Amino acid sequence: MYKRQTYGWAWQNTYYTYGYLAGTIEATSLMADPVIEPENYNDAAAVNTARKADDYTAPASPESAEDYPDIVLILSESFYDFDLVTDLQADTDIMPVTKNLPNSVYGHTISPHVGGGTNSTEYEMLTSNSLILMPSITPFNWLNLYNANSVVSYLKGLGYSTMAAHPYTNSNYRRDSAWLALGFDETHFQSDFTTQETYGDRPYQTDSATYRDWETMYEAMPEDKPRFSFLVSIQSHGDYDMNDASLDIVHAATDYGDYDALMDEYLSCIKMTDAAVQELCDYFTAQYEKTGRKVIVAMAGDHAPSFVGHVADPSFAETDNELQILERSTPFFIWANYPLEHTAAATSTTDPLNRMDMVMLTPTLLQQAGLPLSDYYEYLLEMKHNTPVVTAANDYMKVDGSTAEYGADPALDEWAKGYLMLEYNNIGAHAKRDQSIFDPAE
């Protein structure tokens, strides 16, 4: 479907693996055109593909504009559930809140990478463009994001005010310029998070403190518009050998050998993330009671911690590829401070892990919020009922959770190829974008 490239999310690895000459040639090529053109692409075929979105049936009529809820989207650093790949036993329940939120959808999104690549996940979450067509880049560092279609531009088109925040340096992945290029009305970084609460010797602000500081920013947004706020957390970033063992609040009973200490510190971080979710939900519940503002929240992990491959049990999957999919499956939830009436539309009846590609999370969130949907978003939602995950490894996941290679099922191939056609029409250098595919339906 497309040619392979060598440049990964860590550019140093390319030079180490393939040598200076190959790395430099690849980098030069990517600077000229970082997006791979699908085989047999043409603009007319892309427009025709968008018509498949006509098959999508919304679970309910969209809300009227005055009833649009505030939208909160959180990318949670290294948020992962080791129950997916190992028989984890511990002295306490690690995610009692997240896995049992009332009035919510719970499942797993598939991260582009195992154990790293936050910006790749961030880009897929915000734009619903898959890294399949650009597997060798860090998006914010390579792509021109001005006038790019994203959930930011989409919600601004519906009248939303927009804000993005991250309690760490603004230079990571060029977020300071990338977020402004995407159109966020305001951005906040480390100096705006004044609580500066950390966990032991770890240098990263806790999720609890991050949410408290961010709530102040949220309340300062315009009151006369619906609000969209995007938050990238930092608390659970590696490494996981920074604290003295006496500070661990979770202790794994399972023997992980050399990774015992890392696992305890990591799980302690996840336990704290889970507790902070309850604090955030309590805050928005109180806000609804106080102001009547409706808020819907989606949160997903960006990737598993880097050591996941060292402790994963191969017997948890039938094939190596399915094990890698599990290692890339990060938890997500969608919750609201008002009744969600159509959670069944976002819940798989055949995959107990309720998995979807990261590019499908935002369309699913907007669906649950009752907002008008573009043809692009509708295509992804309809595609989710056929092949919920497509990967850069030339395979995809079926609705029952099993995987297959491209070419094995022509009907599923058509969905995947159609999606890549639409994506290239959106961002490809040799495509003439049909903006009507990506704008809200009239």
Predicted regions and their residues:
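Solvent-exposed soluble domains appended to multi-pass membrane proteins
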Residues: 45-69, 73-76, 81-442
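Long, acidic (Asp/Glu-rich), low-complexity accessory segments flanking structured domains
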Residues: 6-10
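Conserved small/polar residues in nucleotide/adenosyl-binding loops
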Residues: 1-5
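Helix-hairpin-helix/helix-loop-helix acidic hairpins
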Residues: 11-66
